[in-house]
Amino acid sequence: FLPFLAKILTGVL
């Protein structure tokens, strides 16, 4: 799981 995607998910959540 890429940090970039995690950044997006945390932004959405």
Curated annotation (Swiss-Prot):
Expression by tissue, per the entry, reads: Expressed by the skin glands.
Is Secreted a UniProt keyword of this protein? Answer: yes
- Where is it located? Secreted
Asked if the record carries the keyword tRNA processing, the reply is no
Q: Which residues carry this modification: Leucine amide?
A: L13
Gene Ontology terms, cellular component aspect?
Answer: extracellular region
One GO term (biological process): defense response to bacterium
Membrane-spanning intervals of the chain: none
Which top-rank group of organisms is this from? Eukaryota
Record's function text: Antibacterial activity against Gram-positive bacterium S.aureus.
Q: Which protein, by its recorded name, is this?
A: Temporin-1Ca
